[in-house]
From Swiss-Prot:
Its EC number is 1.1.1.267. This is 1-deoxy-D-xylulose 5-phosphate reductoisomerase. 1-deoxy-D-xylulose 5-phosphate binds at residues 123, 149-150, 174, 197, 210, 215-216, 219. Signal peptide: none annotated. NADPH binds at residues 10-13, 36, 38, 122, 124, 203. It is an enzyme of class 1 (oxidoreductase). Catalyzes the NADPH-dependent rearrangement and reduction of 1-deoxy-D-xylulose-5-phosphate (DXP) to 2-C-methyl-D-erythritol 4-phosphate (MEP). Pathway: Isoprenoid biosynthesis; isopentenyl diphosphate biosynthesis via DXP pathway; isopentenyl diphosphate from 1-deoxy-D-xylulose 5-phosphate: step 1/6. Its cofactor is Mg(2+); Mn(2+).
């Protein structure tokens, strides 16, 4: 039996993870949960899965949660201290890292340093601190299983093959809700437009990232660290049907791909049960029911965020962390109605132009760089600190 901590249990990935866990009570036990603002859902999760420890954002939320619970209560903590306690709980054997954004970095690295295997859905951990995180993974001899559908597909497509035989990795992207929109249309895109993803059901921030194609840019950087492959050998193909989740091309011209119905429970179940497989509740793929599979190159003129991510990856050092911080602030401003859709990438580029990349030797240096990126993005956007 695997004892799980789920960081971000009330988010999209956290909820899907608990759906998988509920289907296999003999395989999984929930030790700890962390959540942000959705106390009502967290209360339901506590009553269903009976964790020993839960953590929320603030002391006030912890008190409110405690008052709402009846009967035997779990230990309730809050803040970064609570997230770290959940990530490093002694009984936990695997941590599902599903917190959105750079906020997931500290508890995820704490889990690794405590010797926990990690099912990684928080791509920002590797985007901001990839070299440090992978060094920790090697030192602690833990397993890092990708939960992103694209990286899970690459992981499966590499199975049984030698790394020296890999020519390149090809990440697929749906193109998001604005696949066929022109630049003029994009200038007037609303929050509701951006959140209307054609294939995937995700949280608000990642759905906007998908609309700008920054999500794919973050995944390029994540793949660079996960699979130890130069970013120049990681390509992106637009694939509107989201059936092929990613591909690996080998030196002999062969291409291995992983296909499936778009449903995050598939990669989650794979990460939780590797090297085995279990029925995940994902609808079986019927290729005969498809009218066709199409692929084409991304348009970085309409979607400059992808180009910015490649620029950050090429610059290396602190630049990806700055880019990510600027993106989080810009997306937050867009969702709040303070800036337009195209202003997201414009703000990120301005912040990157102001930054001189430097080496990052510790997680604290990564966090300081993240803080600089956020402050600078707020100044660029004029949204205050």
């Amino acid at each position: 039996m695997k004892n799980l901590t789920i960081l971000g249990s009330t988010g999209s990935i956290g909820v899907s993870t608990l759906d998988v866990v509920a289907a296999y009570p003999d395989m999984f036990r929930v030790v700890a949960l962390t959540a942000g603002n959705n106390l009502e859902l967290l209360k339901t999760q506590i009553e269903t899965f009976r964790p020993e420890l839960v953590s929320v954002l603030t002391a006030e939320k912890a008190q409110a949660l405690s008052r709402s619970l009846t009967g035997k209560k779990p230990e309730i903590m809050h803040g970064v201290e609570g997230m770290i306690a959940a990530a490093t709980a002694s009984e936990t054997t695997m941590v599902v890292a599903a917190i959105v954004g750079a906020a997931g970095l500290v508890p995820t690295t704490a889990a690794i340093m405590a010797g926990k295997d990690v099912a990684l859905a928080n791509k920002e951990t590797l985007v901001t601190a990839g070299h440090l995180v992978m060094q920790m993974v090697r030192e602690k001899k833990v397993k890092l299983y990708p939960v992103d559908s694209e990286h899970c597909a690459v992981f499966q497509s590499m199975a049984g093959h030698r790394s020296q035989d890999i020519a390149r990795v090809i990440l697929t992207a749906s193109g998001g809700p604005f696949l066929n929109w022109g630049r003029e249309q994009l200038q007037g895109a609303t929050v509701a437009d951006a959140l209307n993803h054609p294939n995937w059901s995700m949280g608000r921030k990642i759905t906007v990232d998908s609309a700008t194609m920054m999500n794919k840019g973050l995944e390029v950087i994540e793949a660079r660290w996960l699979f130890d492959i130069p970013v120049q050998r990681i390509a992106v193909n637009i694939h509107p049907q989201s059936i092929i989740h990613s591909m690996v091309e080998y030196v002999d011209g062969s291409v291995m791909a992983q296909l499936g119905t778009p449903d995050m429970k598939g990669p989650i179940a794979y990460a939780l049960t590797y090297p085995g497989r279990v029925p995940s509740g994902v609808k079986a793929l019927d290729l005969t029911a498809l009218s066709g599979l199409t692929f084409f190159k991304p348009d970085t003129d309409r979607f400059p965020a992808l180009k910015l991510a490649y620029r950050a990856a090429d610059a290396g050092e602190s630049m990806p962390a700055v880019m990510n911080a600027a993106n989080e602030i810009a997306v937050e401003a867009f969702l709040a109605g303070r800036i337009g859709f195209m202003a997201i990438a414009e703000a990120i580029e301005k912040v990157m132009d102001l930054h001189e990349p430097h080496a990052l030797a510790s997680i604290e240096e990564v966090l300081e760089t993240d803080r600089w990126g956020r402050r600078t993005a707020k100044e660029v956007l004029g949204v205050g600190c």
